[in-house]
Structure formats: C-alpha cells, structure tokens
Amino acid sequence: MANYFNTLNLRQKLDQLGRCRFMDREEFADEANFLKGKKIVIVGCGAQGLNQGLNMRDSGLDISYALRPEAIAEKRASFQRATENGFKVGTYEELIPTADLVVNLTPDKQHSKVVADVMPLMKKDSAFGYSHGFNIVEVGEEIRKDITVVMVAPKCPGTEVREEYKRGFGVPTLIAVHPENDPKGEGLAIAKAWAAATGGHKAGVLESSFVAEVKSDLMGEQTILCGMLQAGSIVCYDKLVADGKDPAYAGKLIQYGWETITEALKQGGITLMMDRLSNSAKLRAFELAEQIKKSLGFLYYKHMDDIVSGHFSATMMADWENDDKDLFAWREATGKTAFENAPKYDGKISEQEYFDNGVLMIAMVKAGVELAFDAMVASGIYEESAYYESLHELPLIANTIARKRLYEMNVVISDTAEYGNYLFSNVATPILAKEIIPNLQKGDLGEPTPAVEVDNITLRAVNDAIRNHPVELIGQELRGYMTDMKRIAVAG
C-alpha cells in the first residue's frame, strides 16, 4: 500500500486539503433517520467506540459490537464495557455479514488488520466507517469498490461526546466521504445520519475530506494540543522550582492552570483569555508570545511539512514495526519528569490567581494556537478546520492534564497523537528552556506582573492585533454555533 495523498496530483491534493463547508442545520432535518432500521456494528469498544455507540443507540439506531474471540472469552475491558451497557456482542463472523454499516473505532495501528479481517465478511453494497482517516490517507488502505467509505470525526475525546449528548447538545464534528468509495452516492447521507446520531449536528458539522481531517488533526495534536502543553508543563514547573517556589504549589499551578486559562479561551477565544489579565500583564504576555513564535515557529512549520509529505507517518509506522520502541521509551521518560512527580498541594488557588501567576503559560497558549492555525492555513487547510484542530480542542486536552497530569493526557489521546506529541515536545522543551526561560522577568511566572504605566496607543495596538488575528475572526463565527457549551469545572 502507498500513501494515498502522495498518489494524488497537485490539483487533487489542493482540492482535498481545501474541502471544508460548514453545513446548515436544515441539512440535518432528517437527523439519524437514514440509518434507522439498519444494522450497525462497531468494531472496538474504547472511549470513542463505547460513547458513540451509546449516543447512536439513544438516537434509535441498532447497535452491536464485534470483538475478537479472545476478547470475549477472556472478558477483556472492551467486552465488559459493551455488555455492562447492555449491548449485543459477538465475533466478527457472527455480526459482520449482516451489517449495513461497520464502524471501525479501533486504534490507528490496528486498522489494517481490522480491514483485512472484516472486509471479506462484509455484504455487498454495505458501508464502512472511520472516525479518523489515517488508515485511508497515510497507510493507503484500499477498500472493496462496492463498499461505501465514510468518516465521522467528533472533535473531542469520547467521554465528552457522551456528556454533551446527555445534555441534549453535541460536539463539533467533521464528516467526509472517501472519493474512491461512494458507488451508490449514499456516502453523505450515511455520514450525516451517523453525525446526527452522535449529536454532532447540534454543535456544528463541517463537510470535509479524509485528507483535510488527517493532515489538520495530526498537526493540531502534535503541536498546540499536546506537544506544547507537555513542553510548557515541564519547563514552567522546572522554572518555578528553580526560583524557590513550593514544588507542590508549582505542580498545582501548572496542572490546573492550563484548564483554567483555556476555559476563557473556549468561551471567548484568545481575546477573552488575554482580557483576564491586567493591562501590564496583557502587554507582557503579548511580548512573550511574540518571542515564543520566533523561537518555535520553524518547528511548527516543520511538523506541518512532515505531515503533508507523509514523512511523519512513515517514521511512526516504522516504530510500529519496531514494537513501539521509541514510543515506550518517550512515555517512560515523561513519567520521570519532575512535574509528573510533583507533590500534592492542598491549598486553594483562586481562578484569577491562575491567570495572574501564569502569564508565561498564557503566552504559550496564544503563540501555540496562532502558530498551529497559521501553519495549517498556509498549507491549504481551510480556517474552519484549522480552528477546530487548534483552539477549539485545547480546553478538552487541558482538562485531561488537570485530572492526572501528562500521564492522563497521553492515555486519553491516541497512540498516533502521543507519538507526535513526543516528537514535538522533545525538541520544543530544550528550545524553550534555552531561549525563553533565561530571559523571563519578575511577574512572568509564579507571581503577578508588576504594574507599569501603559499608554493608550500601545494598548490599543495590542488589543487590535489580538482581536484581528484570523483565528479570532473565524472563532467568533464558529462559537456562535456552540452557544450552549458546557463550562469545564475550574479547580480551586
């Protein structure tokens, strides 16, 4: 198999990268009806598999789970999750032959094996679904031509897919139809019904492409969503301790700080996050963000280039063949960092204190979001997709750090995201430690920024620069579709 994207000519590549249309709510008037009465079999019962299945069942669809015989016989976690929630469970041979839609929600590295096992069992003119297009785009998987291939990709972890649905809402979602596999022209109808069944249509759906989803998703998770948070956590904690701060306080400030400051990001973008600061602190955060951009800009664009070319995927798949040697080594090293082993702090940190004492962290968020967004757009990805894969998902990932620090983040995200995170953070961490940390001033981290005289012209120019960045302009529009967003709990 060959990387699908690299088999396309330039016109086709640009067309696929630029597929992005925000769908009108009226297009989902039929909701999940197209799939009602059809048999839907989900392969895999992890976070996405279970929670999408629960939502789809509650939307009136016929859902069952196909698991490997050993998972059933040994009553593994996937079997227990499915059966404890009252789902029918069977082997591939028992369930796949009668399925109208088979949804593959296993980890990326298992996709080729799953396809090889289930495709011979699938009935003629059935459909096959993904929630991430890596197997199609990067691996170059070829699916039988009578099978319709679609994607529904919720832009958040599986647990949030369920929680938002239970509230009567949903999470923003990308849908796509593989252009090589839509023999009956039903792909879009299938994807729309599936998205509606998960609740995604209530938060906004982008009609995209497998290519655009994969390239933007990989970029976001490697850089701002995971890599920048990991690098920032490590260097900020080390700096606080080096400055004599209580290690327990430093650990809590970082662990819960990302979640608290990005909650403002979720509700009102970078503008609101920066508005939580005093004028003096805002100007300093803006200055620090510009310095971070200069230091890390090349790394963001390198990751984007490596993703588009397929170099990243080839490197990671080589590690798959080597039994994930690099992945496991990097995971172990992360577990040994000082931040991961910081003592517990029982004192209270107010919401505003996270902002006042975390100016450097805010600067990292601002710089990281803007760099990731700009790199994606410069590579042909539309602004809507770039927004969802940078700013929108950041509070959700920050929430995982609040639960159990970097360990939890790396457990929740996919192995693909985790591998990319390490590639980025392993380079970004020493750069930040060498070029940014030594030049910090009093009040950049761990204590409030001293008040200085601020002139109106400078403040106006900074405010204009913040509010008029393209990620803020498109974000204001897209957040209008998400007016019922749940507020993530802020720790005390």
UniProtKB/Swiss-Prot annotation:
- Its catalytic activity? (2R)-2,3-dihydroxy-3-methylbutanoate + NADP(+) = (2S)-2-acetolactate + NADPH + H(+); (2R,3R)-2,3-dihydroxy-3-methylpentanoate + NADP(+) = (S)-2-ethyl-2-hydroxy-3-oxobutanoate + NADPH + H(+)
- GO process terms (BP): isoleucine biosynthetic process; L-valine biosynthetic process
Q: InterPro entries, from UniProt? A: 6-PGluconate_DH-like_C_sf (IPR008927), 6PGD_dom2 (IPR013328), KARI (IPR013023), KARI_C (IPR000506), KARI_N (IPR013116), NAD(P)-bd_dom_sf (IPR036291)
Cofactor(s) demanded: Mg(2+)
What is a single cellular component term in the Gene Ontology annotation? cytosol
**Cofactor info, note text:** Binds 2 magnesium ions per subunit.
- Looking at the keywords, is Cell inner membrane present? no
Domain KARI N-terminal Rossmann, first and last residues per copy: 14-208
Q: In which pathway does it act?
A: Amino-acid biosynthesis; L-isoleucine biosynthesis; L-isoleucine from 2-oxobutanoate: step 2/4; Amino-acid biosynthesis; L-valine biosynthesis; L-valine from pyruvate: step 2/4
Q: Which GO terms describe its molecular function?
A: ketol-acid reductoisomerase activity; magnesium ion binding
Q: What class of enzyme is it?
A: oxidoreductase
Q: Where does substrate bind?
A: 414
Q: Please state the span of the N-terminal signal peptide per the UniProt entry.
A: none
UniProt name for this protein: Ketol-acid reductoisomerase (NADP(+))
Name the positions where Mg(2+) 1 binds. Answer: 217, 221
The residues annotated as the active site are 132
Name the family: Belongs to the ketol-acid reductoisomerase family.
Q: Name one Pfam family in it.
A: KARI_N
Q: Which residues form a coiled coil?
A: none
Ordered alphabetically, the record's keywords are:
Amino-acid biosynthesis, Branched-chain amino acid biosynthesis, Magnesium, Metal-binding, NADP, Oxidoreductase, Repeat
Q: What does this protein do?
A: Involved in the biosynthesis of branched-chain amino acids (BCAA). Catalyzes an alkyl-migration followed by a ketol-acid reduction of (S)-2-acetolactate (S2AL) to yield (R)-2,3-dihydroxy-isovalerate. In the isomerase reaction, S2AL is rearranged via a Mg-dependent methyl migration to produce 3-hydroxy-3-methyl-2-ketobutyrate (HMKB). In the reductase reaction, this 2-ketoacid undergoes a metal-dependent reduction by NADPH to yield (R)-2,3-dihydroxy-isovalerate.
Tell me which residues bind Mg(2+) 2.
Answer: 217, 389, 393
Q: Does the keyword Zinc-finger apply?
A: no
- Please name the source species: Haemophilus influenzae (strain PittGG)
